[in-house]
């Protein structure tokens, strides 16, 4: 995938590109190294406790907000708080450091970092279809803000790398310290490539996780029977007594189905795009190498030819014995599937597990949400959700 403004920043600042911006052998080389720490079952199990800690902290954060309200409930547009949660969780797993974004007053450096991530994402869309040379020539404020934001994000990565090396030098007993520390220890990827990939993970893993969480909370709020069923599933999984998070999550197929159902109705990207590297004959159609091929995920997910009663939110449909493999394509598939898939799925499952254990969720309006497509699919207006603590 190419995002011209991101590539231009890397070129002007003499940074390498990560796999989000690469193709060919460079992409393959980086991808094989990253797979071991980011998408393999072994790698995933290592960062689950980091994500779980942040999910628990978010529940505490929400309880604090509820206690400020005499009605013993909280009605809120949760989008900005979800943005903070996903940035805090993904950064902890990636860098091995907490930002403190769920505290009442985040530290100045942390606030500067989250502001930079927000600015980078907000300025990416209007720059998406403009040649970077035009922006540079005009020295447009939009372009300068975009560059400054990326500079702050890369500086944050530099600081975290220095902290990791300091820990190595102290010779303390080895323990897991996040994905970046593992990549540095392996020494299978150049330092500048590690930094490039970690910053792209940061950029690609915030809104793309926060928005599906918002849609899921809304659907659970307007489908209370589904919410209750998942809550009972969570209780059942926890009653098994396992302290291993991966086993607990494996015991939550309905919760996983709820996330799949959200991504069926509200895919983050409305298409999956691929360019075949060789000529292909597919169902009697000849597709030359290099042809752009797209699967329309939004229309696929709402097609009655593929899904029965497609407008209904029904996580149970994913528990059937039918082959659903190529009906759920929100993360792509195969060697080109989203590299952040396990990180995003784990974040969402742990977040929802803790939220549903602690709160009942209602919504002010059960009307369908109108959506808009910017850089990703999102609600035109975020829903108002009500959280009531479960005694």
Name these PLM-found stretches.
Residues 42-53, 64-92, 101-110, 134-156, ...:
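Cytochrome P450
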Residues 155, 159, 244-283, 304:
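Conserved cytochrome P450 K-helix E-x-x-R motif and the immediately C-terminal K′/meander segment
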Residues 224-226, 341-378, 382:
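Cytochrome P450 heme-binding "Cys pocket" and the immediately downstream C-terminal segment
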Residues 39, 43, 122-123, 145-213, ...:
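Conserved cytochrome P450 catalytic core segment spanning the I/J/K helices
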Residues 295-321:
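Conserved cytochrome P450 K-helix/beta-meander segment immediately N-terminal to the heme-binding cysteine loop
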Residues 86, 90, 149, 153-157, ...:
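Central I-helix of cytochrome P450 enzymes
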Residues 1-50, 54, 78, 82-91, ...:
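Cytochrome P450 substrate-recognition site 1
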Residues 283, 319-348, 371-374:
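Cytochrome P450 heme-thiolate "Cys pocket" and heme-binding signature region
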């Amino acid at each position: 995938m190419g995002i011209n403004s991101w590539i231009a920043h890397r070129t002007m600042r003499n940074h390498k590109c990560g796999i989000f911006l690469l193709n060919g052998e460079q992409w393959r080389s980086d991808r094989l190294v990253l797979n071991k720490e980011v998408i393999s079952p072994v790698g995933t199990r290592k960062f689950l406790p980091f994500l779980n800690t942040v999910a628990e902290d978010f529940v505490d954060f929400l309880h604090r907000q509820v206690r400020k309200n005499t009605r013993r409930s909280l009605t809120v547009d949760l989008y900005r708080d979800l943005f903070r949660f996903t940035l805090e969780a993904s950064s902890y797993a990636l860098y091995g450091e907490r930002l403190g974004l769920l505290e009442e007053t985040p530290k100045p450096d942390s606030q500067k970092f989250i502001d930079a991530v927000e600015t980078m994402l907000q300025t990416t869309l209007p720059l998406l279809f403009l040649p970077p040379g035009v922006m540079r020539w005009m020295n447009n404020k939009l372009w300068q803000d975009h560059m400054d934001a990326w500079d702050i994000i890369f500086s944050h990565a530099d600081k975290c790398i220095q902290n990791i090396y300091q820990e190595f030098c102290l010779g303390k007993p080895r323990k897991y310290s996040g994905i970046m520390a593992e990549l540095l220890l392996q020494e299978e990827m150049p330092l500048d490539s590690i930094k490039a990939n970690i910053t792209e993970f940061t950029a690609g893993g915030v809104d793309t996780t926060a928005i599906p969480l918002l849609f899921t909370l809304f659907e659970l709020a307007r489908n209370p029977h589904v919410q209750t069923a998942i809550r009972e599933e969570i209780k059942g999984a926890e009653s098994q007594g396992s302290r291993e998070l991966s086993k607990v999550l494996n015991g939550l197929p309905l919760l996983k189905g709820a996330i799949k159902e959200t991504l069926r109705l509200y895919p983050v990207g409305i298409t999956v795009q691929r360019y075949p590297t060789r000529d292909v004959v597919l169902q009697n159609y000849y597709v030359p190498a290099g042809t752009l091929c797209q699967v329309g995920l939004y229309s696929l997910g709402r097609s009655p030819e593929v899904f029965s009663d497609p407008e209904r939110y029904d996580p149970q449909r994913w528990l059937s014995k039918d082959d659903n493999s190529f009906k759920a394509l929100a993360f792509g598939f195969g060697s080109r599937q989203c590299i952040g898939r396990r990180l995003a799925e784990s974040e969402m499952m742990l977040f929802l597990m803790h939220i549903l254990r602690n709160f009942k969720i209602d919504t002010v309006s059960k009307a369908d949400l109108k959506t808009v497509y910017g850089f990703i699919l999102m609600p035109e207006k975020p829903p108002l959700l009500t959280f009531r603590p479960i005694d």
